């Protein structure tokens, strides 16, 4: 958990790399959660925009990262102590520009226009979080497995 003036914040997961740097993961469990919403407003020229579920997940990740950066040393110590106590892992933790990972929804049935707008949205928020659908995640894992099986 991350202690803040708003109370305790609890990301779904925190990934720790081999150097002790952390990233925050937010998983939306509903496979039916939409990543896109159709905008009918003239101002958006009928483009697809981030869905409400995706917008909420992005905001959650941004707040986790904000609070981690604000509480840097305190959070590093807290995570380090938790790792040592619960997992018997003793390694330094570093909060240095953490990134987010958001997993939600499906993308295998998006049409070409939706796929294009989804890609724009993913790239637009790349500096904050890697946005993945469950289909994206499965595709990445399949490619990774195939790579190692063919070696």
Can you annotate each of these PLM segments?
Residues 1-151:
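Charged, terminal alpha-helix-loop-beta segments
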């Amino acid at each position: 958990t991350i202690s803040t003036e708003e109370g305790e914040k609890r990301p779904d997961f925190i990934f720790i790399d081999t150097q002790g740097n952390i990233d925050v993961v937010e998983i939306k469990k509903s496979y039916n959660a939409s990543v896109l919403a159709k905008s009918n407003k003239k101002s958006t020229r009928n483009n697809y925009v981030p869905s409400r579920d995706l917008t909420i997940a992005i905001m959650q990740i941004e707040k986790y990262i904000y609070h981690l950066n604000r509480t840097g040393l305190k959070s590093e110590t807290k995570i380090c102590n938790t790792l040592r106590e619960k997992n018997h892992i003793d390694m330094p933790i570093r909060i240095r520009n953490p990134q987010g990972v958001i997993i939600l929804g499906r993308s295998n049935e998006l049409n070409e226009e939706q796929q294009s707008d989804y890609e724009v949205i993913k790239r637009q928020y790349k500096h904050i979080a890697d946005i993945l659908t469950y289909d994206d995640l499965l595709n990445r894992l399949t490619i990774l497995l195939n790579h190692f099986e063919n070696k």
